[in-house]
Amino acid sequence: MKFKMFSVIVGTESCIASCPFCVSGVKPNEENLKERKINWRNLKIAGNLANRSGIDTVMLTSRGEPTLFPEQISEYLKHLREFNFPFVELQSNCIPIALNKEKYEGYLKEWYEEGLTTITISVVSNRPEVNQKIYMPNSDKYIDLTDLIKYLHSFGFSLRLTCVCCKNMMDT
């Protein structure tokens, strides 16, 4: 069997976005904002299997929003270093980062130093008003995506916009 990517689930199902298509759709609360214990032994087994399978990319993702658990992202990156994956990506809506740059600045520096190469930002459209309607319906506007991209580039990250395909959301 040939694998292409090693996916690592960070955090819980908790998310601050309000996507109508979300599989978990769980808002942050006292219970789901508690970091779960990670089985580092099993991560090592999976990392070794990924190496033997020729995988070159790790995707840190979540059932919710991974950046709600920045300490856990840091811990995963530290444990993944021993496997020398050339590409380590984080899939996120990046809303927490955009709304609180001061909180995340130290983490972003650390993540880059620990080997995070790419951040994939989830969007549903190239139009801010459509992204706002899906991700942040209770806010007046969507995050400033252009500013966020410049900010993340300033740390050295490669970026990719990952478009969640929804009917009538993206221009032709």
What positions do the PLM features span?
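Canonical Radical SAM [4Fe-4S] cluster-binding loop centered on the CxxxCxxC motif
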Residues: M1-R41
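Conserved glycine-rich "GG(E/T)P / GGGxP" loop and the immediately following alpha-helix
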Residues: E31-E89, N93-T172
